[in-house]
Amino acid sequence: EAKIVDPASNWDLFAEKAKQLLLEDKVSVVFGCWTSVSRKSVLPVFEKNNGLLFYPVQYEGEECSRNVFYTGAAVNQQAAPAVEYLMSPEGGNYKKFYLLGTDYVYPRTTNKILRAMLLAKGVPASNIGEEYTPFHHQDYQTICGKIKKFAAGGGAAVISTINGDSNVPFYKEFGNQGLRAVDAAIMAFSVEED
């Protein structure tokens, strides 16, 4: 019998709900969590109670647990090849990269790895921008203005690790500022159907 719980993106509830599933509902396995924050909040519960979590989304790596199956792509399987593609002639031969993400583990770790990769491939530090916003951020006017300046002269791409409901206002403001894909291509890793 399947048990469904919804912590409603309230990070404090994730561990409590995981404990309920494992100890009260006696589930054999949990499929869930969507962010690194939620995964990291339940990890001690799964390890203490020898539970099994299937984590279904891309993740930043740098973590290994006997109690978690990481089924999503790690940075070297998704984000790094995507950026390498953007640097190639087939991908647009981009020379400038603006790393924009939500302020939590996955974007910060992913962008740390991407920044190191870009520098190792000869991209000057001045051609790498980096910025983070809180969860549920809605006002991208200033950030899109910075991207517009950064992209002046061409050859720029935005690497987006924005999460959740912040995507829609980002794309709207990107368009409101007259930016187009030819001005700054966007490579995004966490976009939903909204």
What are these language model-derived features?
Residues 60, 67-178:
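Extracellular/periplasmic Venus flytrap/periplasmic-binding protein
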Residues 2, 53, 97, 128, ...:
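Hydrophobic/aromatic residues located in beta-strands of well-ordered beta-sheets
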Residues 38-40, 79, 167-168, 193-194:
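Short, well-ordered alpha-helical microsegments
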Residues 174-194:
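Extracellular/periplasmic periplasmic-binding protein-like sensory domains
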Residues 49-52, 123, 180-184:
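A short helix->loop->beta-strand "cap" motif at the edges of active sites that frequently abuts
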Residues 1, 33-34, 96-101:
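Short beta-strand segments enriched in small/hydrophobic residues
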Residues 7, 102, 189-191:
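Cofactor-binding loop segments of dinucleotide-utilizing enzymes, especially the Rossmann-like FAD-
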Residues 2-62, 71, 132-141, 164:
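Beta-alpha junction/loop-to-helix N-cap segments that form part of ligand/metal-binding clefts
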